[in-house]
Regions:
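Cys/His-enriched microdomains
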Residues: 72, 88, 106
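Long, charged N-terminal interaction/targeting segments
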Residues: 1-64
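Flexible glycine-/small-residue-rich
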Residues: 33, 67, 110
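Short cysteine-rich clusters marking metal-coordination/redox-active sites
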Residues: 74-77, 90-93
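Short functional micro-motifs and their immediate structural scaffolds
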Residues: 82, 95-99
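Acidic pyrophosphate-coordinating catalytic loop
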Residues: 37-38, 70-74
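Short, flexible, mixed-charge glycine/proline-rich loop motifs
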Residues: 62-70, 79-84
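Short metal-binding segments enriched for Cys and/or His
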Residues: 100-110
């Protein structure tokens, strides 16, 4: 359910940028969402459609969502691998001395103004 909070944060941020840059309308917002962030893209889209109606600059804006693939780094052998496929255990050396490099974040990648 944190998708609603995420959408409100994105809308607040974009609306502030629209004011600061004297924009009249926003055409689209592109979000990058990590594969293991816990954010469910179709919930983001649903909340976006609801929340944008209450804004000044985003009423007609499209939300574009791109996935950031989850990648884990193994400190034992120095290799990276796809997190979703192998989880915490390195498929090359079977070490659990690993950490997530990408895939847990979300980023406002692009804002397109009209």
């Amino acid at each position: 359910m944190h998708e609603l909070g995420t959408i409100h944060y994105v809308i607040d941020t974009v609306e502030k940028l629209a004011v600061e840059n004297q924009l009249s309308k926003i055409a689209s917002v592109t979000l990058e969402v990590g594969e293991v962030s816990g954010i469910i893209p179709h919930f983001l889209s649903d909340y976006w459609e609801y929340a944008k109606k209450k804004t000044t600059y985003l009423q007609e804006a499209e939300l574009k969502i791109e996935t950031i693939h989850a990648v884990t780094y193994c400190q034992s052998c120095g290799k990276t691998y796809p997190t979703v496929q192998y989880a915490k255990i390195c498929p090359y050396c079977q070490s659990d001395n690993t950490f997530l490099v990408t895939g847990n974040e979300y980023v406002i990648k692009e804002i397109e103004a009209m």
